[in-house]
Amino acid sequence: MSSDSDRQCPVDGDIDQQEMIPSKKNAVLVDGVVLNGPTTDAKAGEKFVEEACRLIMEEVVLKATDVNEKVCEWRPPEQLKQLLDLEMRDSGEPPHKLLELCRDVIHYSVKTNHPRFFNQLYAGLDYYSLVARFMTEALNPSVYTYEVSPVFLLVEEAVLKKMIEFIGWKEGDGIFNPGGSVSNMYAMNLARYKYCPDIKEKGLSGSPRLILFTSAECHYSMKKAASFLGIGTENVCFVETDGRGKMIPEELEKQVWQARKEGAAPFLVCATSGTTVLGAFDPLDEIADICERHSLWLHVDASWGGSALMSRKHRKLLHGIHRADSVAWNPHKMLMAGIQCCALLVKDKSDLLKKCYSAKASYLFQQDKFYDVSYDTGDKSIQCSRRPDAFKFWMTWKALGTLGLEERVNRALALSRYLVDEIKKREGFKLLMEPEYANICFWYIPPSLREMEEGPEFWAKLNLVAPAIKERMMKKGSLMLGYQPHRGKVNFFRQVVISPQVSREDMDFLLDEIDLLGKDM
């Protein structure tokens, strides 16, 4: 029970505790616990949900597109610990105190829905996806059998089928996963199982030295997956890229031949469509030719760039993707389906996913059920409990239609082009390279460095600029923008356009604000 001091402000819905406890005459007790009736106060709970939803609407949804609001209310960790009541006590907190905590959580959280949040490969607020998330949180389903999740399994099937069509396959299979990293791990394991099915039961002891190949610009999840699966990071061969960050096919084939010469067993090539930093797209047709010649599984990590498939204008970036054996595609990025919404799509239609991952749990996947058990898809996943993530994307797709999703991609890339043109016009801004996608990489050169020769001292000083500007913008709360060093290049900004709430004015503001924050450096 809460202390008297906690209950100075009574809340509607509070009831006399005596009303919740049955009289001793009628009470049924087991181990001293009264079992009569529910012990939750439904009225108080419903009122709390209603008030919390109102708070979310007022403080999150209605402010999501307001550029006058801060992107973040920065506090260092130790200070934030003092500002938030993080302690969990023996007695519960009253509803009004919980609402205060909710307000604090919103206030000090980064507003990723803000039009000037450019920090990651996700951003913005899709209202339809948000409602879908409210629904799934309230329903609390787990997507593994049709009996407990009939609607969401059918939705997932419909969404996967449509995504497979956009890749260009006539048929296929797939599953939604908690992140593109997991999709890449699934694909790596699936390729290994296809190459050496005995590994599932007999393990690695009798297997050859398996080797996989991926771009030097690949996502770091490839190394993590190799480590997690016992393949080993030393058996990940990184293929050199050209000046734009694309895998060089000739270098790939050289490495494949070298691995065979050393007695290793190549089994997988992972190409990337939309690299994390530069936004590069590997030449899929040429890579697929090599995979066919050497009987290698081709996986395409299109977690970031896959959404370009929705655009008739930009889908050429992924030319040849139909030749892949598997594809990772994250609708929660460019298509704003809400984190997490990530699919692994597989060309194989012989139940390879189920063969690779099934454990045939008898308490879940009984074969004598009264309905078609082919809809029980849980054995295609390494998870048991699994969220209905496809529903978020389905709701957005239903609301906007394919043409609306196409317009979302086209507009984001048009805004990117506008920003590139503005960078070229402005003194003190320098593009790293012409972008291929929505990743705009550039340096800001403050006035104090503009007359310096581009030698070691210049680059050493420029390396300090982006982190210092990032600190200032975070503490001011005016915008958020990512930066990084990359393959020998000193720290530069990476700006990504995603949200349809972003305008031309926001692009202009971004450049103006960087100049304002950095001109005295």
Curated annotation (Swiss-Prot):
Pfam families listed in its UniProt record: Pyridoxal_deC
Name of the featured protein: Acidic amino acid decarboxylase GADL1
Subunit record text: Homodimer.
GO CC terms of this entry: cytoplasm; cytosol
Tissue expr: Expressed very weakly in neurons and not detected in astrocytes, brain or liver.
Function: May catalyze the decarboxylation of L-aspartate, 3-sulfino-L-alanine (cysteine sulfinic acid), and L-cysteate to beta-alanine, hypotaurine and taurine, respectively. Does not exhibit any decarboxylation activity toward glutamate.
Superkingdom of origin: Eukaryota
Biological processes, Gene Ontology terms: carboxylic acid metabolic process
Modified residues (N6-(pyridoxal phosphate)lysine): K333
Stored InterPro entries: PyrdxlP-dep_de-COase, PyrdxlP-dep_Trfase, PyrdxlP-dep_Trfase_major, Pyridoxal-P_BS
Catalytic reaction(s) noted: L-aspartate + H(+) = beta-alanine + CO2; 3-sulfino-L-alanine + H(+) = hypotaurine + CO2; L-cysteate + H(+) = taurine + CO2
Membership in a protein family: Belongs to the group II decarboxylase family.
Record EC number: 4.1.1.11, 4.1.1.29
Essential cofactor(s): pyridoxal 5'-phosphate
Organism of provenance: Homo sapiens (Human)
PROSITE patterns tied to this protein: DDC_GAD_HDC_YDC (PS00392)
Alphabetical UniProt keywords: Decarboxylase, Lyase, Pyridoxal phosphate
GO molecular function, one term: pyridoxal phosphate binding
Gene: GADL1
